[in-house]
C-alpha cells in the first residue's frame, strides 16, 4: 500500500484479516504444515482464510453435521475449489481431466458451473487437495486468486454472433486477469512443489500490495447488447465499444456489487458508476489504477464496508475517478453509446461469422451430474472426446459447445440429445431462473437455493399457466444468503435466504439487469412467496401494457417504488 497519506484513508483499528494478510509471508502462512496434519480434515487459524487466496473455501456437509457431532466427530471438512478461467473457456482435453477428477476424487462426483463463469469442485478431502491442483496444472488450469481479497476470475460475454469481436474481448479478459494476478510464488511452491527462491529482498506485489486488497474485487468484459455477466454486480467493468465490427475501446463502469448484511443498513447493493470511454491502449493502466485506488482508499477497518462500491460512496465518484485518471495518466472521454437488451443465453445453435457453430445447452443450476434419464456428465465427456472446438461456460451457469465445424454439427447434436443436454421442452421460466449453491456445502447459507429452485420454478410455471402467461417468464433468482452469489439483487423476482425455509422477497428489477429490486416482503415462507406471486402475476396478466415485463409492471403499478439511488433509498418502503 502507498505510504502517502490521503484524507480518504479510513483510520482506526484494522480488521483482523489485515493482520492475517500482513503476516502471511505473501499468502504462504503455514498451509504446508496443515496439509501434513492428519488429525483434522480442516485448516486451522489463519490458514482457514489463506487458502481462499489459492482458490479454495473450507466447507463441510451440513446435512450430516449434527449426526457427526452426536458421534463425537468433527464436521466432515472438505474444500471447494473454484478454477481461474478468464472468459470461461475450456478445451476438450481440459474438460476430460476435470471430469475424471470429479469422478475419482470428490465426494459429490459433480462439476458445478457458477455465476463467475467458471467451474467448482465440491467435496475434496484434504489428502486429495494437492493432487487436485497438480491435475489442473497439467492441463493448464489454476485457481490462483479466485477467492480472497484480490481481483477474481475475469468474466467475458459468451457466444455473441460476432465471433471475431468476442475473440478480441476474450483476449483482453485474459490480459486483465494476468495483469492483476498476485505475483507471489506461494501457489506454485505449496501445490506444485515449485522451487522456493531464497532472497533477502522482500517480495513485492506491485499492484495488489503486500496487504492485498481490502476486500474481494470482481471484473468483467461485456459485449453489448448482451449483459450476461451482469455488469452491476461487479467492481470494474469494461463495456466493449466496436466500430465496423472491430473493438476500439471500452466504456469503464466502476463500483457495482450486490452483497449486503441482513439488519445492517450501512450495507446495500449498488449499480456501477460510468467513468467514461478509453481506447484499448489504456486498458491495463486503467485496470491497475482502479485496483490500486481501491487498495489505498478502501476501508480496512470495517470489512462490511470494504468493497469498492462503499469507497465510491464515501469519497465521491468524482474524486475516485480523478485519482484513477491521475494514476493511469489518462483522461476519460465521454462514454460511447451502447444498449443492453438481454441477459439470457442464446440456447440452441448459433452460427458465427467464421462459419462455425455454437450450441448452448441449459444446465439447471449449473450442476453437471448424471441423473436418471439425463446423463449430463457422461454426455459432456462423450462430446469432449470428439469435439474439435472448445467449451465456454456462461455467467448464467450454462454450457456452450463452441467452434463446431459444419460437418460435426449432427454428431454433436445427436450426443447432446442422447444424454439429455438438449431436452424436448424447457419453459422460458426455467431458462430465466438461477440459484447459488447454498446448502448443504456453503457455510454461509441461511436457506436452500440450488435444491429449492427446481420445485420453486415448477410452482411458478403453474402460476404463469393459471393466468395465461405460459409463454412469458420473469427473471427469477434465489440466493441462500445476502452475499448474493445468485445475483438475486438484479432480478425481477429475487429471493434472499433469511433462515430455514424463509426468504426476503424482492421485486422490481428489470430484464436488462439495470435496476435493483426492492424488498416487498420480509422473512416469509415458501408458501407465502407463491401466494404473493399468484396475486401479482394475476394482476400483471390483466393490467400490463403490451409487452410490459413483470419488473416494469410492478414499478409502474406502484407495487414497489423503484430503487433509484441505492445508497440512499434501498431501504425505503
Curated annotation (Swiss-Prot):
Pathway-wise, it operates in:
Sulfur metabolism; hydrogen sulfide biosynthesis; hydrogen sulfide from sulfite (NADPH route): step 1/1
Q: According to the UniProt entry, what is the EC number of this protein?
A: 1.8.1.2
Q: Name one GO molecular function term.
A: sulfite reductase (NADPH) activity
| Binding positions for [4Fe-4S] cluster per the UniProt entry | 436, 442, 481, 485
Q: Where does siroheme bind?
A: 485
Keywords (A to Z) from UniProt: 4Fe-4S, Amino-acid biosynthesis, Cysteine biosynthesis, Heme, Iron, Iron-sulfur, Metal-binding, NADP, Oxidoreductase
> What is one term from the GO cellular component aspect held by the record?
sulfite reductase complex (NADPH)
Top-level taxon in the UniProt lineage: Bacteria
Q: Looking at its record, which EC class is this enzyme?
A: oxidoreductase
Reactions catalysed according to its record: hydrogen sulfide + 3 NADP(+) + 3 H2O = sulfite + 3 NADPH + 4 H(+)
Which free-text remark accompanies the cofactor? Binds 1 siroheme per subunit.
What this protein needs as a cofactor is: siroheme; [4Fe-4S] cluster
Keyword Signal carried by entry: no
A GO biological process held by the record: cysteine biosynthetic process
| Function (record text) | Component of the sulfite reductase complex that catalyzes the 6-electron reduction of sulfite to sulfide. This is one of several activities required for the biosynthesis of L-cysteine from sulfate.
Q: Which PANTHER family does this chain map to?
A: SULFITE REDUCTASE [NADPH] SUBUNIT BETA (PTHR11493:SF47), SULFITE REDUCTASE [NADPH] SUBUNIT BETA-RELATED (PTHR11493)
Quaternary structure, from the entry: Alpha(8)-beta(8). The alpha component is a flavoprotein, the beta component is a hemoprotein.
Similarity annotation: Belongs to the nitrite and sulfite reductase 4Fe-4S domain family.
The name this protein goes by in its record = Sulfite reductase [NADPH] hemoprotein beta-component
Species whose genome carries this gene: Alteromonas mediterranea (strain DSM 17117 / CIP 110805 / LMG 28347 / Deep ecotype)
Organism ancestry: Bacteria, Pseudomonadati, Pseudomonadota, Gammaproteobacteria, Alteromonadales
